[in-house]
Structure formats: structure tokens, C-alpha cells
């Protein structure tokens, strides 16, 4: 899967408007890769990304009739809810950022340096980013 992230001509309004003025220049990508341990239910998921000198912007559109949104706090385990994930690797072989967003706006952000799965399901080595880090 290949996706080209466009430079934002204007800062997107952060109002969740899929067809907002800034998003018109962003390519739409359909996400059809699901984790093997997930259920057989696969909702329709699309995303758009933009960037500028300081920020990566993203918006997801999910069409689903089964939505779970229980977790509401920062760094909550939103993977137990209906959620989407976004990964960014700033430098090859130096770790990656893992962003997980729930249907109600709660999110989890980790910087993963060793993705080896432990028996708990967690990655072997990661740092939870604070709200101040963002």
C-alpha cells in the first residue's frame, strides 16, 4: 500500500469535517488491512493525511453499525473500543509513534522502540507520551 501525503496549503479546521476546505487537496486512502486477532467484522475505513513544517494532520471516516466507545481518558486502552490506529516512523530502525483514536475522541500515544509482543500483549519497550509531549 502506498500513499502520498500532500503538504497542507492551509491548516485544516480541527472540526472533524471530512469535506472541510483543507481536506480537498488530500488523497483518500481506503484502509483494508486488519489485525489478525480482530473479528471478522471489518467496517469501511478511509483516511486523509496532510502535513506542514510542524504538524501531521489526519482525519478518518469510518462507516460501521456496531460502535463501542467506553474509554474516555488520555492513554486509556482504546483498542478495546471501536478505534483506528496510525503509525509514524520518523527515522528507519529508530522506533515509531503509535497513535490510537477511539470513536469518542479518546486516544493513546506511545513511542515504541521494541515492538516484540509480550505475553500481556504489550510491546516489549515503549514510552507513553504525556499530553505535554504532544
Give, region by region, the residue ranges found by the protein language model.
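Structural preference for beta-rich elements and adjacent junctions enriched in aromatics
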Residues: 1-134
